[in-house]
């Protein structure tokens, strides 16, 4: 029996030695450009065939256990239009296991993303990817795999959205046709706790095709099943600088979103801010041509079509001001009210 134990001990010892040698060799192998290029080619060939469209990864650089770097990533949609193009994508891994993955930071540089709704169906051009990864088994309990992320950084990225069912607006910010150039974004302090998702928007600046220039945007963001809340908000636009302790909206039932202007309740606490009416005109085209600089503070609350204002302090030029509490009329038909500067 002792002899058998010794033989087994030696056998397992040799086995683990070879396993260790294999792991070391694999660690060196996976670092070679030849092996990583092979992985990239296999991955792109696989998804090109699965999705029946063009997929390409120019370069893969993997540092075992803590870093994945991709270069020249390209995905076309089923109409052969460019869906995603990324010059470089870096994933810094903090830790992982069988049921969890924690990413310390995701860094995307010089990317281009174009998302659009088809005419006349309204189907999104990325739907084929969503369908591919959707589970066909709706009866089984999903695995409890958790993905955590500490920080996202976007550098010099372009984001475009189009709904081709709706014609483009001639002036103003068109939410159905958005094209953001030179997007720079930093998001950190992610929390994902059940229905609550929260994060810190540390920096966001970009310029839209309409001419609206977001020179800076910072806020603490919280999203749950009853609404959205931004605290410690700072916004700098073309000629406006806005400070707000809170910008939030809430609803009791998701069905309220179908009648957004009448059933979703806002609460906006604006601290002393400087707003140019030309910037407001991006959101309210009827005010196009106005360029007065307004000093403003106060709390705006209630539904969009029946806003109320408390502690309003509005100042224009040197001697014109308005202070008080206001109950605004229904602006559901803005064109019915003549705006003049």
Regions found by a protein language model. Give the residues of each.
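A short, amphipathic edge element
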Residues: 51-58
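Transmembrane beta-strands of outer-membrane beta-barrel proteins
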Residues: 231-233, 269, 310-313, 325
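Repeated loop/turn-to-beta-strand initiation elements of outer-membrane beta-barrel proteins
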Residues: 227-230, 305-309
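Flexible beta-edge/linker motif
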Residues: 32, 59-123, 127, 131-165, ...
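Outer-membrane beta-barrel translocator/channel fold
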Residues: 276-277
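Amphipathic hydrophobic-ligand
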Residues: 79-91, 166-184, 211-220, 226, ...
């Amino acid at each position: 029996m002792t002899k058998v134990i010794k033989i087994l001990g030696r056998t397992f010892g040799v086995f683990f030695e070879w396993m260790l040698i294999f792991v070391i060799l694999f660690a060196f192998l996976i670092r070679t450009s030849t092996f990583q290029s092979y992985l990239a080619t296999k991955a792109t060939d696989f998804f090109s065939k699965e999705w029946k469209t063009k997929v390409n990864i120019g370069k893969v650089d993997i540092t075992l256990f803590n870093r994945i770097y991709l270069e020249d990533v390209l995905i076309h949609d089923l109409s052969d239009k460019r869906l995603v193009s990324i010059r470089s994508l870096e994933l810094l891994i903090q830790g992982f296991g069988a049921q969890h993955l924690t990413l310390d930071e995701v860094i995307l540089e010089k990317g281009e993303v174009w998302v659009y709704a088809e005419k006349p169906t309204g189907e999104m051009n990325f739907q084929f990817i969503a369908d591919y990864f959707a589970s066909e088994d709706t009866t089984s309990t999903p695995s409890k795999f958790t993905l955590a992320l500490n920080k996202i950084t976007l550098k010099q990225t372009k984001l475009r959205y189009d709904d081709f069912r709706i014609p483009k607006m001639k002036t103003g910010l068109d939410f159905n046709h958005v094209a953001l150039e030179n997007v720079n974004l930093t998001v950190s302090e992610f929390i994902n706790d059940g229905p609550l998702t929260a994060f810190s928007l540390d920096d966001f600046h970009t310029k839209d095709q309409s001419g609206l220039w977001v020179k800076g945007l910072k806020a603490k963001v919280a999203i749950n099943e009853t609404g959205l809340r931004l605290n410690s908000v700072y916004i700098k636009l073309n000629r406006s600088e806005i400070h707000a302790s809170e910008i939030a909206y809430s609803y009791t039932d998701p069905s309220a979103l179908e009648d957004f202007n009448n059933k979703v309740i806002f609460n906006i606490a604006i601290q002393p801010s400087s707003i140019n009416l030309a910037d407001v005109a991006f959101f309210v085209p009827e005010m196009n041509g106005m360029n007065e600089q307004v000093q403003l503070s106060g709390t705006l609350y209630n539904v969009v079509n029946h806003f109320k204002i408390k502690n309003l302090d509005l100042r224009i030029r040197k001697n014109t001001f308005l202070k008080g509490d206001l109950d605004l009329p229904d602006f559901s038909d803005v064109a019915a009210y003549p705006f003049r500067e």
